[in-house]
């Protein structure tokens, strides 16, 4: 066996092992845990010498006074004495432990509301594909994720929705599904199969809603399609957040879409008509509307750095970093599939074999936050907010809700115990807790 084949086999085994560990951990009851001596970074700002305590259900206390930390630990049955505290260099993330972060940054878990896969698997690939792809993103700090499903024949999309629905009860990290298609403009289809694109007539809307069984969180729709505005109203009435994207809509039509109930712009700048002083298009319509969350792929390829800074500045507290990550994320260059379409990944950039169209990214939210701070000059609080609180707000997950129970996106009492520790120099994720379960 060649050395490269052996290395590939070892990598597959390692990733399957981590996916199994995630499965087991999320299936077990959570235990109290605490973290101290961290640099807290969330949407509310930065704080030094910070600590956090969870009772195994939610965050119950935070602060920067040592005496308060000991009392908070005692209230959930933990011992804050020095002899019982593990350091980040030890096996300190065991359930029920008290961890000394040794000055590492502590952030909420990242929330990705638009991603298709990772680790060689797509969210369209059934239970096994979802397990592996979610493990890949979990490894890099994405504790909660909306699973994006690519355009396929309607029967296939319905079956994929049913799979996501079936996994949600056992997987608190899965927030639901996002349908990117099939109601997209042919002229802005990007890496979607043109043979599967449709006008969103009521029959198709009803079929997808029925198959989803309540798991559908968002759906991208080109509002200029004949039934586009009506479909936006129908999905919004059913509790789904429609997104304007993959469209050729003018400014007025995009405004109609948002007024009809669309609450998201799918990856701003990509797969839509751009900014023009006499033909403003959909972007200003989204920027002007305080109800709209704006997705942005901060990889420097989908959107180059000057436009990332400009776009974020349009609506800094409404712009959510998303990855649009496909199966090749965190994998070597090579040949992959996006739905039924062939994709070549070269230098980490995914393009369709057929016409060279960009075919998703190989980005993680870990990398998006790193780029924002270390390359683009974002403040730490702004960068973290774009990967935590802002995407959570798009679906009301920033407050108590039936899906996540506790709100997401802040390190504050009452919020979900989704916590990351990061290397302060590189912003690389080193430790992960999801729903109070230690996963890395």
PLM segments and residue spans:
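Residue-level marker for buried hydrophobic side chains located in beta-strands
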Residues: 34, 109-111, 243, 321-322, ...
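Active-site gating loops and adjacent loop-to-helix segments of metal-dependent hydrolytic enzymes
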Residues: 136-146, 185-213, 255-268, 272, ...
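N-terminal metal-binding scaffold of metallo-dependent hydrolase/deaminase domains
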Residues: 3-79, 85-90, 426
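His/Asp/Glu-enriched, well-ordered alpha-helical/loop segment
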Residues: 284-294, 312-325, 329-422
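Alpha-helical scaffold segments that flank or form the walls of functional sites
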Residues: 104-105, 113, 123-173, 196-211, ...
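Divalent metal-dependent hydrolysis catalytic cores, especially in the metallo-beta-lactamase
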Residues: 116, 131-160, 173-185, 212-224, ...
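Active-site core of metal-dependent hydrolases
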Residues: 206, 210-331
């Amino acid at each position: 066996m060649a050395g490269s084949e052996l290395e590939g086999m070892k990598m597959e085994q390692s990733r399957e092992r981590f996916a199994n560990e995630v499965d087991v951990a999320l299936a077990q009851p959570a235990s109290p845990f605490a973290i101290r001596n961290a640099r807290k970074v969330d949407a509310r700002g930065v704080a030094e010498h910070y600590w956090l305590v969870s009772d195994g259900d939610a965050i119950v206390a935070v602060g920067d006074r040592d005496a308060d930390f000991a009392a908070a630990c005692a209230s959930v049955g933990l011992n804050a004495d020095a002899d019982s505290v593990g350091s980040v260099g030890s096996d300190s993330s065991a359930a029920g432990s008290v961890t000394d972060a040794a000055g590492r940054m502590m952030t909420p878990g990242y929330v990705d509301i638009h991603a298709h896969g990772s680790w060689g698997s797509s969210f369209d690939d059934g239970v096994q594909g979802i397990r592996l792809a979610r493990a890949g993103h979990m490894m890099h700090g994405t504790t909660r994720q909306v699973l994006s499903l690519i355009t396929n024949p309607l029967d296939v999309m319905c079956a994929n929705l049913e799979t996501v629905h079936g996994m949600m009860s056992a997987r608190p990290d899965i927030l639901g599904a996002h349908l990117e298609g099939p109601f997209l403009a042919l002229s802005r289809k990007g890496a979607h199969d043109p043979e599967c694109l449709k006008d969103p007539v009521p029959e198709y809307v009803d079929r997808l809603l029925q198959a989803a069984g309540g798991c559908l969180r968002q759906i991208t729709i080109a509002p200029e399609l004949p039934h586009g505005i009506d479909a936006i109203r129908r999905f919004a009435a059913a509790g789904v957040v429609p997104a304007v994207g993959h469209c050729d809509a003018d400014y007025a039509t995009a405004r109609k879409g948002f007024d009809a109930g669309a609450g998201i712009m799918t990856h701003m700048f990509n797969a839509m008509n751009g900014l023009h002083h006499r033909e403003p298009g959909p972007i200003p319509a989204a920027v002007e509307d305080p109800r709209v969350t704006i997705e942005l792929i901060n990889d420097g390829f989908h959107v180059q750095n000057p436009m990332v800074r400009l776009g974020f500045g349009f609506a800094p507290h409404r712009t959510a970093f998303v990855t649009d990550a496909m199966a090749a994320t965190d994998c070597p260059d090579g040949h992959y599939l996006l739905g039924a379409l062939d994709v070549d990944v070269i230098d980490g950039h995914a393009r369709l074999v057929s016409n060279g169209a960009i075919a998703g990214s190989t980005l993680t939210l870990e990398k998006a936050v790193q780029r924002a701070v270390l390359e683009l000059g974002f403040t730490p609080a702004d960068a973290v907010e774009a990967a935590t609180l802002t995407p959570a707000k798009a679906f009301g997950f920033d407050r108590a809700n039936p899906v996540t129970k506790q709100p997401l996106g802040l390190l504050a009492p009452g919020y979900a115990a989704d916590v990351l520790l990061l290397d302060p120099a590189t912003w690389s994720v080193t430790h992960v807790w999801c729903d109070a379960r230690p996963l890395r």
